[in-house]
Amino acid sequence: MASPAVPANVPPATAAAAPAPVVTAAPASAPTPSTPAPTPAATPAASPAPVSSDPAVAAPAAPGQTPASAPAPAQTPAPSQPGPALPGPFPGGRVVRLHPVILASIVDSYERRNEGAARVIGTLLGTVDKHSVEVTNCFSVPHNESEDEVAVDMEFAKNMYELHKKVSPNELILGWYATGHDITEHSVLIHEYYSREAPNPIHLTVDTGLQHGRMSIKAYVSTLMGVPGRTMGVMFTPLTVKYAYYDTERIGVDLIMKTCFSPNRVIGLSSDLQQVGGASARIQDALSTVLQYAEDVLSGKVSADNTVGRFLMSLVNQVPKIVPDDFETMLNSNINDLLMVTYLANLTQSQIALNEKLVNL
């Protein structure tokens, strides 16, 4: 990701907000004999970025960033990272699945933004399958915006992606995110740069300002529109956004949701015994619901559902048949193993603490 940001001298024409597609005109550049016609967001590797012709607009970027008005050092951008990317335009029904860590990271980066920054942007990472795009990670990218230009630290983004690949080599660049409830002319420029890293990238918007009383989360992909041979525009088409989570993420989300009922918005971590007790209570409530449903079906109060019946039968068949005496023996053996591991862990901790005190004497 080595392409610099470019100025936006001609503001795009933006249509109505989502769920209708958002239409944005591509940025215009000074006419020169060697400048090709504007291209869609998924720019070929040989197309140079447009450059502003007004020297008064060019302003120095922050340290480590590439000024928006500077032309690319090489006319051919860096090649995309290898690996399966988004296979062309999104087919109908393509779904974007977001994990809770994405939203938490975006909100955290917005709260820690530099003074005076209107919004924050970042890179989305994840995986792709035939029916959905799963966004599992992200990181923020420093940038500066003004009315005339935008400067993005693409070198920082490249280095961060290389570090993420060492931990999660299967995660690919899927697109980028931005805080706010609308799409600006700068969004078109930034989206064009990410199209060089991933075909048909996703643009995720998170309304951290709560314009309508809630955090609106929307995802878009861009498509080219316009008359051939004329100034082309970019249309941002909304996608379906769903939320997915692993079991460990679900535990954290459930714990965070409990703070809604706390007066000071703070809740302490429960002990292992309390967690086991809470899980047992939830299982008991679920079994009570199943038994009540079965009794209502047998009594004729509720019509039978074959799908529910097959699901319950599958659950019953998965329960192993164990003799009560054998189950008690297995449980006691596991408890003894757990107590032994706990004892050894505490003994090791005490030995380490004693060793540190002896070293400091």
Swiss-Prot record:
InterPro entries, sorted: eIF3f (IPR027531), EIF3F/CSN6-like_C (IPR024969), JAMM/MPN+_dom (IPR000555), MPN (IPR037518)
Protein name: Eukaryotic translation initiation factor 3 subunit F
PANTHER family listed in its UniProt record: EUKARYOTIC TRANSLATION INITIATION FACTOR 3 SUBUNIT F, EUKARYOTIC TRANSLATION INITIATION FACTOR 3 SUBUNIT F-RELATED
Source species of the chain: Mus musculus
CDD domains: MPN_eIF3f
Function per UniProt: Component of the eukaryotic translation initiation factor 3 (eIF-3) complex, which is required for several steps in the initiation of protein synthesis. The eIF-3 complex associates with the 40S ribosome and facilitates the recruitment of eIF-1, eIF-1A, eIF-2:GTP:methionyl-tRNAi and eIF-5 to form the 43S pre-initiation complex (43S PIC). The eIF-3 complex stimulates mRNA recruitment to the 43S PIC and scanning of the mRNA for AUG recognition.
GO CC annotation terms, alphabetical: eukaryotic 43S preinitiation complex; eukaryotic 48S preinitiation complex; eukaryotic translation initiation factor 3 complex; eukaryotic translation initiation factor 3 complex, eIF3m; synapse
Residues with Phosphoserine modification: 52, 262
Biased composition (Pro residues): 74-90
